[in-house]
Curated annotation (Swiss-Prot):
One term of GO molecular function: 3-oxoacyl-[acyl-carrier-protein] reductase (NADPH) activity
Primary gene name: CBR4
Pfam families registered for this protein in UniProt: adh_short_C2
PROSITE patterns the UniProt entry points to: ADH_SHORT
Organism: Homo sapiens
Marked site: Important for interaction with acyl carrier protein (ACP): K169
Outcome (variant: K169E): Unable to restore growth of an OAR1-deficient yeast mutant. Increases NADPH-dependent reductase activity with acetoacetyl-CoA. Reduces NADPH-dependent reductase activity with 9,10-phenanthrene quinone
GO biological process, one term: daunorubicin metabolic process
InterPro entries with a match to the protein in the record: NAD(P)-bd_dom_sf, Sc_DH/Rdtase_CS, SDR_fam
Identification of the protein by name: 3-oxoacyl-[acyl-carrier-protein] reductase
Subcellular location: Mitochondrion matrix
């Protein structure tokens, strides 16, 4: 199998760390983000012949066009990472409906659409590997994150069901569920207070999550699995 990987949400955070690690391991990368300039900057930092694309994962025609373009320029995609995500914290009673919809569209529907688009090629070539980036709150829930928790919890159910659907085609689907990790999404959190509740006593780094993502991408006998990377936080939630 060729080593062509599409990383959605690859311009920053966990997605960018995944792209960096995979580039070092010899993969050809498509770095995909809503902001094309950010994607180009991330792809440029990788060196080599990696490419950047702009895509709003919540729009099916955007996703379809992106896959057509990246396969035209890089070849068939056989590895897919879904790391695009947004979060708008707030109590449910104070959350605007449009904010609910945008989180569900980006965090859940977006991954569904990219997986659907990738299936055509992966089924044709009888093989592929997908890792969707979830969250520990999708498994445990968290006050003030009911919508985000729903989107990430839904991603787990979707991934497990899809893993069953495509296993006979030699396509694997797994989830990595991070806890608190240093990203733009967590930069405003009260780290000193929160890390006291983490058994390992600190926030994680994006590269630590990236190693888990690549492990699942490359593990030929693992599918339908949720790998939690949270410093032990799940032990006390």
């Amino acid at each position: 199998m060729d080593k062509v990987c599409a990383v959605f949400g690859g311009s920053r955070g966990i997605g960018r760390a995944v792209a960096q690690l995979m580039a070092r391991k010899g993969y050809r990368l498509a770095v995909i983000a809503r902001n094309l300039e950010g994607a180009k900057a991330a792809a440029g930092d990788l060196g080599g012949d990696h490419l950047a694309f702009s895509c709003d994962v919540a729009k099916e025609h955007d996703v379809q066009n992106t896959f057509e373009e990246l396969e035209k320029h890089l070849g068939r995609v056989n590895f897919l990472v879904n790391a695009a995500g947004i979060n708008r914290d707030g109590l449910l009673v104070r959350t605007k409906t449009e904010d609910m919809v945008s989180q569900l569209h980006t965090n859940l529907l977006g991954s569904m659409l990219t997986c659907k688009a990738a299936m055509r090629t992966m089924i044709q070539q009888q093989g592929g590997s997908i890792v969707n980036v979830g969250s520990i709150v999708g498994l445990k829930g968290n006050s003030g994150q009911s919508v985000y928790s729903a989107s990430k919890g839904g991603l787990v159910g979707f991934s497990r069901a899809l893993a069953k659907e495509v296993a006979r085609k030699k396509i694997r689907v797994n989830v990595v569920a991070p806890g608190f990790v240093h990203t733009d999404m967590t930069k405003d959190l009260k780290e000193e207070h929160l890390k006291k509740n983490i058994p390992l006593g600190r926030f994680g780094e994006t590269i630590e999550v990236a190693h888990a993502v690549v492990f699942l991408l490359e593990s030929p006998y693992i599918t339908g699995h949720v790998l939690v990377v949270d410093g032990g936080l799940q032990l006390i939630l």
